């Protein structure tokens, strides 16, 4: 009698299939399970670059918050920052805030401070050198943007940045602000 080995998990095809399955599992795990639309963002403590601390819920008490995970080595992160700073200033009267959470190592703190100083950004800078917040909010792919409304509800999530996407980012901000403005007009 001849034994026939199932070819499904053997050889190159098996390796490719196993890799594909692993990627699907990893993607589903990393795909923002704590920050899916309409979920409440966890109230995580954030250490700010200026040495003070705050929480995500404190930052959303007065208005919406856009969280962005970034690193000094991330070119797309640096490109989107100028737009996020512009939106931070443009919509400040509506209590909109931007929190840029840096994930560089503790050794890079001086580099982070120098970069922010040189750019004269006005948004809040959080530090997450051990990537605790990034892992909890599934922000390990950079940049990851998470837009949260005044109540702490995640309204939009986006990973990556290419030129032109700043238009979509601002549209999402306007949508969340429109809801908050309508709530103010009712009261």
Language-model segments: residues:
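Short, internal strand/loop/helix patches
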Residues: 115-150
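Conserved helix-turn-beta segment immediately C-terminal to the redox Cys motif
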Residues: 63-64, 81-102, 117
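Conserved redox-active cysteine motifs that mediate thiol-disulfide chemistry
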Residues: 69-86
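N-terminal targeting signals for export/organelle localization
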Residues: 1-47, 156-158, 185-187
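A short beta-strand-turn-helix
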Residues: 45-64
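Thiol-based oxidoreductase modules, predominantly thioredoxin-like and allied folds used
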Residues: 95-109, 121-130
